[in-house]
Amino acid sequence: MKFQMIAAVLLIAFCLSVVVTARMELQDDEEMKNGSFQKRRTCIDTIPKSRCTAFQCKHSMKYRLSFCRKTCGTC
């Protein structure tokens, strides 16, 4: 009986992970078609001097995985 409960819980968890993954992929496809994917990932060229530090100027990117330039242009 205990084994059946564990198997059922694992099966439900697997099914939920498949559903969530499929929904995320579908949402990304819709965003690519609508152009909102790029709008959401647009970058800024500069950040306020008050927020700049040496480390931030060296490493800061608004979105690491997009085509953005460094954001510390005004430091």
From Swiss-Prot:
Residues 23-40 form a propeptide. One of its GO terms (cellular component) is extracellular region. Residues 1-22 form the signal peptide. The record marks 47, 49, 51, 60-61, 63, 67 as: Important residue for binding Kv1.3/KCNA3. Residues 43-75 form the ShKT domain. The keyword Disulfide bond applies. Disulfide bonds join 43-75, 52-68, 57-72. This protein is also called kappa-TLTX-Hh1a. The TATX abbreviation is given to this protein, since the abbreviation TLTX was already given to a spider family. Its main location: secreted. Keywords: Cleavage on pair of basic residues, Disulfide bond, Ion channel impairing toxin, Nematocyst, Neurotoxin, Potassium channel impairing toxin, Secreted, Signal, Toxin, Voltage-gated potassium channel impairing toxin. The record marks 62 as: Key residue for binding both Kv1.2/KCNA2 and Kv1.3/KCNA3 (occludes the channel pore like a cork in a bottle). Belongs to the sea anemone type 1 potassium channel toxin family. Type 1a subfamily. The keyword Cell wall biogenesis/degradation does not apply. This is Kappa-thalatoxin-Tas2a. GO terms for molecular function: potassium channel regulator activity; toxin activity. Inhibits voltage-gated potassium channels (Kv) with higher potency for Kv1.1/KCNA1 and Kv1.3/KCNA3 (IC(50)=3.4 nM). InterPro entries: ShKT_dom. The lineage of its organism: Eukaryota, Metazoa, Cnidaria, Anthozoa, Hexacorallia. It is found in: Secreted; Nematocyst.
